[in-house]
């Protein structure tokens, strides 16, 4: 029986759990740092991060299902330092090119498209119905929200969040820790640590 540990028992965690089942995991074991939760729908929560770290050998794989990019990366680094068997999960209805690179800890959701020679970093969220075109470079801990379209040869820095329904023009460079607001159209480069919103997207101070 294939068993996976999922750290993070929120709404995002539920989606990750279903993808894990579709990928062949028969047993889902949740962990969460909230003291107020004992279950995630029908799945029992078996403890917090420390409990997961102390029981890693019991699992065939583990993944972090936390929406906050910074926290997700903190947790993935902790698990890596403890030799966790971190996996990626790809929904069966996603279209992922055999020429793309998907690094560990990343989740690719239903109807997402990853085209040839795109590289997706560690512990990214590529959400429902989003498109990453050819030759894109997506850094570690990035969240690409539902219905986002990233054109070819775009570079997105680590821990950046691209809001739902946004579009990014080809050859654009988006920095580290950037927030792009929902429905935005990015036609110019965005520097590190910026927030950009609108059509076209403009940097907000």
Residue ranges and their predicted role:
Residues 37-95:
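Phosphate-bearing ligand-interacting subdomains
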Residues 17-20, 74-78, 120-121, 191-192:
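Short amphipathic alpha-helical segments
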Residues 1-40, 46-49, 53-54:
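Hydrophobic, well-ordered beta-alpha structural blocks that scaffold small-molecule cofactor pockets
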Residues 128, 137-140, 145-205:
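Glycine-rich hexapeptide-repeat left-handed beta-helix
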Residues 76-132:
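Hydrophobic, well-structured mid-protein blocks that either form specific transmembrane helices
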Residues 28, 60, 104, 158:
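Conserved acidic residues
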Residues 34-43, 99, 188-191:
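Short loop/helix-cap segments at secondary-structure boundaries that form the rim of catalytic
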Residues 62-65, 108, 197:
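Redox-cofactor binding/interface segments in oxidoreductases and associated redox assembly factors
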């Amino acid at each position: 029986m294939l068993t996976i540990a999922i750290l993070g028992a929120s709404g995002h965690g539920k989606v990750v759990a279903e993808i894990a089942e579709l990928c062949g995991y028969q047993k889902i074991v949740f962990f969460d740092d909230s003291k107020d939760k004992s279950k995630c729908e029908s799945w029992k929560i078996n403890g917090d991060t420390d409990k997961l770290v102390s029981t890693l050998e019991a699992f065939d794989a583990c993944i972090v299902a936390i929406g906050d990019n910074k926290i997700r990366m903190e947790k993935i680094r902790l698990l890596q330092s403890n030799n966790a068997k971190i996996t990626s999960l790809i929904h069966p209805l996603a279209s992922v090119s055999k020429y793309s690179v998907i690094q560990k800890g990343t989740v690719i959701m239903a109807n997402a498209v990853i085209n040839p020679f795109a590289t997706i970093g560690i512990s990214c969220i590529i959400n429902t119905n989003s498109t990453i075109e050819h030759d894109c470079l997506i850094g570690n801990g990035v969240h690409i929200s539902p219905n986002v379209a990233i054109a070819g040869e775009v570079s997105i820095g680590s821990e950046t969040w691209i809001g739902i329904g946004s579009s990014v023009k080809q050859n654009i460079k988006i920095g580290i820790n950037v927030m792009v607001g929902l429905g935005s159209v990015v036609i110019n480069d965005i520097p590190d640590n910026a927030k950009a919103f609108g059509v076209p997207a403009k940097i907000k101070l």
